[in-house]
Amino acid sequence: MNFRIEQEIAIFEFDDGKANALGHELIEQFFFALDEAESQAKGLLIAGRKGVFSAGFDLKEINEGGSAAAKLIKKGAKLFHRMFDFPKPLVACCAGHAVAAGAFLLLSCDYRIGSGGPFKYGLNETAIGMAPLPVFGSELALSRLSPRFLSRAVIQSEMFSPDDALEAGFLDQIAEANDLFEIGKSKTLELSSLPSVAYGKMKRSIRASSLERMNIS
């Protein structure tokens, strides 16, 4: 984990050298970054490693089944709620694949910037037999994805190229890989220049219904 504050914005880079799978440890690192950013910075930029933003929940922990799997999914649900409810600008730089819970990370952010390349974005839960989606998943998909792509993304488990992910609603912008991080910083600074209290109030007002349904605390 690399967390730092530059020019009054927080930056959280996560890279486990593999698939950036969301297990208990990485989720705790996300909570730390969110808490620190909320108290010390005007916005937060998150960035996965080149090639893989996140491949989703850690299947080793999920495949333990029973209470272990349930605990991980519940912890993930709390993370996505925390991100979707984060009162300051939350920007993601995605330089690789974002699948399943990795795609939900993107859907939880305010502004998502991806890079071109042979990368896939999507929700593969139907394809791997994990249905129905947890409430956090259906709410994020309904809130952020284009209605025209909703069935293809959620029900049909279609994987999207960066260009199609932009149209579907997984991304807001595509940038050259070499420029991605600097563009992400610039966007976070731009959004952080907006009145902070108004930004948080506006975000929560338009997401209130989804946040209420997503809340499991």
Regions found by a protein language model. Name each.
Residues 2, 28, 40, 48-79:
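Glycine- (often His-adjacent) and acidic-residue-rich active-site loop
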Residues 90, 112-113, 174:
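Short, well-ordered beta-strand core segments
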Residues 51-54, 98-100, 120, 209:
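Short, active-site-adjacent cap segments at secondary-structure transitions
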Residues 93-99, 153-158:
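Glycine-rich beta-to-alpha transition loops that act as phosphate-gripper elements at the mouths
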Residues 1-49, 81:
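Conserved CoA-thioester-binding segment of acyl-CoA-metabolizing enzymes
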Residues 46, 105-107, 165, 184:
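Hydrophobic/aromatic residues within transmembrane alpha-helices
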